[in-house]
């Protein structure tokens, strides 16, 4: 089949083409089906984020070519159904009961048709019931989403992806999963996320435009617009915000939040830590309760910790600050100045012990 052009007709359903289902707009779902069927998708107006093109320009572009005019926001239309329609040699309509979902044929013939009064000369092609639901309200959006979820999940399982509970797994049509990865119950794989072979994601995990490397474990966590290297473990309850790059064999533990930071190979941030606007090298140990103090109320500053350093529990790193290679920061310190390589820093008050203080207070009736 020769390449064809597709167009959506704006009008009463414009806002429904914009509705998001499984992390994509209705239009984007339809455009993916058109692309898989061998067509090119364009827009008459700003129905969604796609390329804008006027009807006149589209007529010129499609001169002599076949045109698919999508009339209803039926996000569950499949490439197979569109191919079945486009295989017709004559002007045809894809219908579901009295509703016309799409028109097919030469540009002049298609644009001249009134969908509400199709002549008998236009061939009718019946759409599958599960594909013909137009998205017009939350209830229909849910029904369509369920169809898309089943279709997408089944497709990935047939390619060798393990979905422990397909009923609670939602995968964007833009996501890429390698055979041999595993998604546990409650996974939301949104946007252009990728999951490599051997990775185990979930349960109850959100990936949005995230890249998860081979043999990673991401447990009950959220990762957005970030990359996780091979063999790294994340979670439970980690929050990786946009702009993070995590190396291989690293550990991002429970209640750790990362933002706009790089973490080197083999570095361990095991629990209860905030790392923001920072560059951490390789083989660093970050203790419990460490905080990068990166915001002064007006601007944000970066923190650098070089390879093989040790950051003790409850250390505050006041940015901008640089910790040299192989340094040791004792627990409880607030670091405000750069630390040279292989230095030991203790930045806390010396403890004062007052013997028998409690006993004396009790004898005096003050406790």
Where in the sequence are the language-model features?
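Structural signal for interior beta-strand "rungs" in well-ordered beta-sheet cores
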Residues: 162-347, 351-352
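Terminal amphipathic alpha-helical/low-complexity segments used for targeting or macromolecular assembly
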Residues: 1-167, 173, 180, 341-343, ...
């Amino acid at each position: 089949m020769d390449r064809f052009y597709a167009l959506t007709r704006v009008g009463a359903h414009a806002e429904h083409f914009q509705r998001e289902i499984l992390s994509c707009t209705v239009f984007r779902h339809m455009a993916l089906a058109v692309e898989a069927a061998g067509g090119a998708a364009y827009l008459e107006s700003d129905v969604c984020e796609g390329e804008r093109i006027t009807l006149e320009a589209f007529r010129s572009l499609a001169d002599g070519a076949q045109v698919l005019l999508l009339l209803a926001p039926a996000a569950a239309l499949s490439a197979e159904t569109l191919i079945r329609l486009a295989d017709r040699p004559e002007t045809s309509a894809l219908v579901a009961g009295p509703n016309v979902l799409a028109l097919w044929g030469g540009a002049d013939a298609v644009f001249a048709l009134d969908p509400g009064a199709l002549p008998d000369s236009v061939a009718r092609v019946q759409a599958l019931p599960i594909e013909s639901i137009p998205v017009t309200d939350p209830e229909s959006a849910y029904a369509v989403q369920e169809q898309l979820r089943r279709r997408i999940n089944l497709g990935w399982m047939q390619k060798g992806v393990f979905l422990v509970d397909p009923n609670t797994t939602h995968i964007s049509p833009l996501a890429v999963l390698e055979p041999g990865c595993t998604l546990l119950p409650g996974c939301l794989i949104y946007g252009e996320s990728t999951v490599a072979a051997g990775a185990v994601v979930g349960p109850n995990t959100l990936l949005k435009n995230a890249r998860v490397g081979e043999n990673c474990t991401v447990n009950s966590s959220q990762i957005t617009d970030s990359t996780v290297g091979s063999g790294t473990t994340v979670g439970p309850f980690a929050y990786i915000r946009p702009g993070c790059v995590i190396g291989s064999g690293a550990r991002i533990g429970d209640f750790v939040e990362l933002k706009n930071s790089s973490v080197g190979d083999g570095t361990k941030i095991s629990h209860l830590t905030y790392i923001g606007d920072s560059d951490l090298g390789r083989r660093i140990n970050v203790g419990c309760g460490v905080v990068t103090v990166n915001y002064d109320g007006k601007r944000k500053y970066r923190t650098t910790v070089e390879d093989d350093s040790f950051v003790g529990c409850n250390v505050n790193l006041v940015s901008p600050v640089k910790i040299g290679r192989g340094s040791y920061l004792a627990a409880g310190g607030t670091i405000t100045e750069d630390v040279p390589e292989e230095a030991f820093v203790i930045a806390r008050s010396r403890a004062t012990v007052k013997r028998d203080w409690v006993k004396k207070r009790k004898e005096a009736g003050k406790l």
